[in-house]
UniProtKB/Swiss-Prot annotation:
Catalytic activity: uridine(55) in tRNA = pseudouridine(55) in tRNA
Gene Ontology molecular-function annotations: RNA binding; tRNA pseudouridine(55) synthase activity
CDD domains for this protein: PseudoU_synth_EcTruB
UniProt function note: Responsible for synthesis of pseudouridine from uracil-55 in the psi GC loop of transfer RNAs.
Name recorded for this polypeptide: tRNA pseudouridine synthase B
Domain of life: Bacteria
Organism: Bartonella tribocorum (strain CIP 105476 / IBS 506)
Enzyme Commission (EC) number: 5.4.99.25
SUPFAM superfamilies: Pseudouridine synthase (SSF55120)
Keywords: Isomerase, tRNA processing
Pfam family, one: TruB_C_2
Active site positions: D49 (nucleophile)
Family membership noted in the UniProt record: Belongs to the pseudouridine synthase TruB family. Type 1 subfamily.
Any one Gene Ontology BP term: mRNA pseudouridine synthesis
Length: 320
């Protein structure tokens, strides 16, 4: 029988609500956080473009089991649209493809916003992670191919014009559902206003249930460790980690599941759930069969499961 390989790192669990700086890829951010915490496992809940900054939820350990719930959460973005140019990537990185001397008035912009609120059809950018015949759209676009990407429904809950500092650009804030491309909004609004547009700045400020108040920067994380006198290269374990201080910056795993009902368990119930058994659950409110709920043991998240005729059936069990 093959010997199971021991996992490297600490079995640390929780959420780092990371304030990703511009220029850093989401995968790079995950690698840096995983290294810093010396975590066995890490992942993020929703890619943020390299040119964008802001809230990137990074799950460590057991929290990775809750990533799908955060990815379904509403997201809030604040962004600047620069008027007068359309670009190949719909942001500052791309080549200019169309120009216009027209600049929209505030009245024209406000009149357009209702058309972009609610359930709308949106075509993702040519440079996006959408798969076309097994290939990423951005790979095909880099090879010079102009591809047909079918439009899809997205939900925009709120769309506000924050300010128009100059006639050249406007600042907006939206709360939207999964799969919304802010770059597509800039492109489409520019076309509708007859002036063209692209994203000049993009910052994510919320991914439900996390918000700006939860953000932690790379500098704040590094402040929880002390430099190793022997080296200054962080890629060679140049820091002696103060894990106690670092771990205090984590948000508990269960915070990602605020959208689900929570129920405490007795010792006996918890023991059965830990073994994967179903248990009777006395709900404080009427719950539908197949509705997902969380169960807690000693105020710690123990399992996610569904109800079936008053029985709780564990689907995901957490190590506590």
């Amino acid at each position: 029988m093959a010997r199971q390989r021991k996992k490297k790192g600490r079995p640390v669990s929780g959420w780092v609500v990371f304030d990703k700086p511009k220029g850093m890829k989401s995968t790079e951010a995950v690698s840096k956080i995983k290294w810093l915490f010396h975590a066995q496992k890490a992942g993020h809940a929703g890619t943020l473009d390299p040119l964008a900054s802001g809230l990137l939820p990074i799950a460590l350990g057991e929290a990775t089991k809750t990533v799908p719930y955060v990815m379904q959460g509403k997201k809030t973005y604040r962004f600047h649209i620069a008027w007068g140019q359309e670009r190949s990537t719909d942001d500052l990185e791309g080549e200019i493809t169309k120009t216009s001397l027209k600049r929209p008035t505030q009245e024209e912009i406000l009149a357009l916003l209702p058309q972009y609120t609610g359930i709308i059809l949106q075509t993702p950018p040519q440079f996006s992670a959408i798969k076309i015949a097994g290939n990423r759209a951005y790979d095909l676009a880099r090879e010079g191919e102009v591809i047909e990407i079918p439009p899809r429904e997205v939900e925009i809950e709120t769309f506000k014009l924050v300010e128009t500092p100059t006639k050249e650009h406007s600042v907006f804030e939206i709360t939207c559902g999964k799969g919304t491309y802010v770059r597509s909004l800039a492109r489409d609004m520019g076309r509708d206003l007859g002036c063209y547009g692209h994203i000049a700045d993009l910052r994510r400020i919320a991914v439900a249930p996390f918000c700006e108040e939860d953000l932690v920067t790379w500098d704040e994380l590094k402040a929880a460790i002390s430099p190793n006198k022997n080296t200054t290269d962080e890629n060679e374990n140049s820091f002696e980690k103060d894990f106690l201080t670092l771990d205090e910056l984590l948000i508990e795993t269960g915070a990602a599941l605020d959208c689900l009902p929570h129920y405490p368990l007795t010792d006996t119930q918890a023991q059965r759930v830990m073994r994967g058994h179903s248990i009777p659950l006395s709900a404080q409110k009427t719950l539908l069969d197949e509705e997902e709920v969380c169960v807690l043991y000693k105020e710690q998240l123990l399992a996610i499961g569904t109800l079936d005729k008053g029985l709780f059936k564990p689907k995901r069990i957490f190590t506590i």
